[in-house]
Each structure stands twice: as structure tokens, then as C-alpha cells.
Design a protein with these regions (language model features):
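Lipid interaction determinants
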Residues: 5, 14-116
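Sec-dependent signal peptide recognition
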Residues: 1-7
Length: 116
């Protein structure tokens, strides 16, 4: 289960992102990127709604959570099965159809998710 934590918005094997990545600093810009889309990687499919909910599945487990935008960071809490993951504020970068989430306000592990 600990592995699931890192895959979901923190990291395991992240694909490389080119240096043209641009930081997403605005809630409205973030919502425009994810609204009506899924965020995916191997074994993971998530939806992030404009209303502040997170849902989906990862490695056969249901994922639920909430998110807010706070001072330029995506801040989320999540639950996978019966495990609750505390709030973590993450720096978000965009490169084409990919988003990179960097935990701990940009100082932590990364997770790359494709926008579909």
C-alpha cells in the first residue's frame, strides 16, 4: 500500500518531461487543463473535478479525495481503500498533455500523469 502513495501524486517511475515544462500557478488554468479529462499513468486513472473532488482507481483500489488551490499549489488529501493520506501541497508543471506533480511544494517526489 505504501507504493500506492508514491504513485498517486508523489512518485514511482515518472516519465521524463522535457525542459519546456511550465509551472501552473493559477487555479483557473489548472481547472481548464483537467476539467472533463482523466489523469492517467500505468495502473492509475484519476479525475480531478472543478468542485474540489478527486476520484478514480489505482492498481485495483478505489481512490477518493479532495483538493484546493492554495498560494500557487495543488493541495490534496486522498484515501485509497481504507488508507488515508494527509494533505500535501504540490507544485504542478505542464508539458503538452502531461502534468507533473511535485510533492512538498516542489521539494519532494514527482508523479507524471497524462491528460486524456
Amino acid at each position: 500500500m505504501r507504493t500506492l502513495i508514491f504513485v498517486l501524486f508523489t512518485a514511482l517511475a515518472s516519465s521524463a518531461m522535457a525542459e519546456e515544462s511550465a509551472r501552473v500557478t493559477d487555479r483557473g488554468a489548472f481547472v481548464n487543463l483537467v476539467q472533463g479529462k482523466s489523469l492517467t499513468s500505468l495502473g492509475v486513472r484519476l479525475t480531478v473535478s472543478p468542485s474540489g473532488s478527486i476520484g478514480g482507481r489505482a492498481f485495483g483500489r478505489d481512490i477518493s479525495g479532495t483538493w484546493t488551490w492554495n498560494n500557487g499549489y495543488f493541495c490534496r488529501t486522498m484515501q485509497a481503500g481504507d488508507r488515508v493520506f494527509p494533505r500535501n501541497c504540490q507544485l504542478v508543471q505542464q508539458n503538452g498533455n502531461r502534468l507533473r506533480f511535485i510533492a512538498d511544494k516542489g521539494a519532494g517526489a514527482t508523479a507524471d500523469l497524462r491528460i486524456r
